């Protein structure tokens, strides 16, 4: 399971002109699911994201988590995080989970985040989305539950 995590001042997502999710201060998470992912990957990434100390404290040091600052999490499904661009000019997405599995694990990931006592908003799985965000920092991190990077 892979995630791009961005610290944001605010973020929202629309599908077919309708807003499906919005947060103020918090983190925007683009989530990709791999074919071998499961509950361990969900637990690892959800706990990591909620507890990452990427928000400034009173001394302006990145020392606080999204939970500690009362922020929200906006989760967007993003199978392209498993795109392989090493050969040719068109990415291969063979490394991504099949849609049925990815949909189930995406939903379980969102539910696990909600158990972490943070407000969670989402896009819509397997839909074209417009994501609007205001980066804060910017702070952008790449996470992989298999610790590839």
Swiss-Prot record:
Reactions this protein catalyses: glycyl-tRNA(Ala) + H2O = tRNA(Ala) + glycine + H(+); a D-aminoacyl-tRNA + H2O = a tRNA + a D-alpha-amino acid + H(+)
Keyword annotations: Cytoplasm, Hydrolase, RNA-binding, tRNA-binding
InterPro entries from the UniProt entry: Daa-tRNA_deacyls_DTD, DTD-like_sf
Compartmental location: Cytoplasm
Keyword check for Transmembrane: no
Gene Ontology CC entries for this record: cytoplasm
Coiled-coil annotated spans: none
EC number(s) from the headed UniProt entry: 3.1.1.96
Locus of motif Gly-cisPro motif, important for rejection of L-amino acids: 137-138
Main location class: cytoplasm
HAMAP family xrefs: Deacylase_Dtd
Subunit structure: Homodimer.
Entry domain remark: A Gly-cisPro motif from one monomer fits into the active site of the other monomer to allow specific chiral rejection of L-amino acids.
Function noted in UniProt: An aminoacyl-tRNA editing enzyme that deacylates mischarged D-aminoacyl-tRNAs. Also deacylates mischarged glycyl-tRNA(Ala), protecting cells against glycine mischarging by AlaRS. Acts via tRNA-based rather than protein-based catalysis; rejects L-amino acids rather than detecting D-amino acids in the active site. By recycling D-aminoacyl-tRNA to D-amino acids and free tRNA molecules, this enzyme counteracts the toxicity associated with the formation of D-aminoacyl-tRNA entities in vivo and helps enforce protein L-homochirality.
Protein name according to UniProt: D-aminoacyl-tRNA deacylase
Lineage per the UniProt record: Bacteria, Pseudomonadati, Thermodesulfobacteriota, Syntrophobacteria, Syntrophobacterales
């Amino acid at each position: 399971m892979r995630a791009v995590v961005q610290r944001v001042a605010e973020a929202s997502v629309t599908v077919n002109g309708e807003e499906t999710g919005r947060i103020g201060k918090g983190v925007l998470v683009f989530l990709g699911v791999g074919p071998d992912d499961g509950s361990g990957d969900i637990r690892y990434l959800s706990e990591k994201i909620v507890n990452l100390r990427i928000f400034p404290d009173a001394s302006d040091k990145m020392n606080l988590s999204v939970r500690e600052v009362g922020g929200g999490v906006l989760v967007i499904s993003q199978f392209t995080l498993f795109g392989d661009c090493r050969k040719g000019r068109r990415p291969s997405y063979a490394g991504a989970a099949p849609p049925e599995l990815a949909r189930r694990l995406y939903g379980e990931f969102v539910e696990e985040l909600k158990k972490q006592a943070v407000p969670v908003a989402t896009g819509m799985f397997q839909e074209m989305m417009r994501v609007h965000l205001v980066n804060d920092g910017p702070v952008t991190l790449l996470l992989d539950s298999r610790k590839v990077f």
